[in-house]
Amino acid sequence: MALNNEQIELQNKINDFVNSDKNGFFGVLGGGGTGKTFTVCQTINVEDALFLGATNKICSVLKKYLTNNGYFKFEVKTIDSFFGFKIKKDHNNVTVITHKKPNLSKVPKIIVIDEISLINDRSFDLLMEIKDKRKFILIGDNLQIPPIEATPTRDKNGFKVSKIFTQLDYSFELKIQNRQKIESKLFELISKFRQNMDKSFSYIQMIEKYSNGNDILYYDINDKELKNLIYNKNPIAVGYKNLTCLSFNWLIGSTKFNDKGYKVNSLNVGDTVFFDGFYKRDKDVFYTSEIVNILEIDNFCEETIKIGNEFATYNFKKIKVKNENGIDKIIFVGNGYKNTLYPISYRVTKQIDKLKKQIDNSSNVKYKWILKNKIAELNTEYSNIKTGFATLKKPYAITAHKSQGSTFEDVIIPIYDYAAKVSQDSNQLLYVAMSRASGRIIFVNNKSNFKDNSNRYSFTQMERNSIASYYDYKCNVCQIDLEDLRDIDIDHIIPLAFNGTNNIANLQPLCKNCHKEKTKSEKHNTKTKNYATTI
């Protein structure tokens, strides 16, 4: 594919930078689908450059892109790997990260970093230390969502950005979009939205203006046409909140299989699933959002391991999958916390409690240090064990944060999910969701939505179903089957009176009896709390 005029101009700018005697940061900016990586690879000698990615997923996508475009001799690493990051847990179970400076004598003079919007503050500080020693070509979109930091960095328009965008020595922005058809309404919508993201405006009015029944659709959550579309096509919902994504996982799955009792966590031979987090066991590694096909399932495997001075027996699933490269792998999946991680966690906690008592009873500083190291080793070992059990999800819904770097033909956007106190923040999230679509956006509204901190809320049938489905339609206390939705009460694990919230981690399905008993206990505790505050 030939470069367009804009890309040729960028190519000339990059050549001027590469051939100059100056080092530093050259930013190649622009929205998704503008050909940033393509232009860079058409300009530099790929074999004489080092490619870095902010995450494992980016590196995986980058390797695939380079291979598919006829490049074979290239080097791709994560920024963490480049700086020799090591992650451990200390005696307080706090993550400790160490690093070392790279040997620059072995590093090419050109370093290309893709998706720089995902560079965190820690990596930024290290890159700044070698900024004047190499020529960096930094590829990214400043309107994508940056990593969450304690103190976010905002640009002059109020958007959250990675700090690296504030330190570019040279930059060029590509504006001609290639992902969507240029003459399409979808292209016009995403382009106009990007140009006006610094403003606050009504999403509903925008959708009603651009909806055309073709590549921009607009439905209510209960619309039959929405369900027909889900049944006949393969859309993916991109939401903001985890509960919304869980609800759409259930809605899409139950619609496709015509099963109101559909279980969102069920895994079956033939399923296509994606990893909902980083997985590493021995040499097998899978990254968040990586897709595999399930070939075989062994539902009950048992194993005994030694952790510290104790033995733990646990059970799990062994699943044979085929990855996107056609390679078969065996991965481990838990059979629920109680059956898999709890037997290990219990023995780790037991040993740590014993070591802590020894620390408290000792006055020997060196001995205390030895004991704290033992605790740190146990915490690190348990953390590594947890990483060795995969969380697999059906590819029906994903959060906007996790969707970055992906492209889907049909994207469902639950528009009611995108709201924030700062309009720039919700605009950034919505922009990420919309720019995932290559063919069509299906906006969905739901007048019964709620806020995380709302004190009263009647859950919709879809939400009740999705929460019950997440727990395999069982009461989370007594474990009896809940086959009729009328028998299910959705409960806040931490009551709203004690600052609990309406998010998925704090919601559980209970049978009527268990909910009644829990409510009695909560009323007593609330009275005690109120009494205590008036003394």
Model-derived regions: residue spans:
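Histidine-centered nuclease catalytic patch
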Residues: 479-509, 522-525
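Conserved helicase motor core of P-loop NTPases
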Residues: 3, 8-36, 40, 133, ...
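The −1 position to Zn-ligating cysteines in a subset of zinc-ribbon hairpins
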Residues: 405, 474, 489, 510
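Inter-Walker segment of RecA-like/P-loop motor cores
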Residues: 50-107
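Short, charged surface segments at domain edges that flank catalytic/cofactor-binding sites
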Residues: 449-479, 501, 505, 527-533
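Walker B catalytic acidic pair
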Residues: 114-115, 140-142
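C-terminal accessory regions
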Residues: 39, 307-452
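Loop/turn-to-beta-strand initiation segments
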Residues: 108-110, 133-137, 441-442
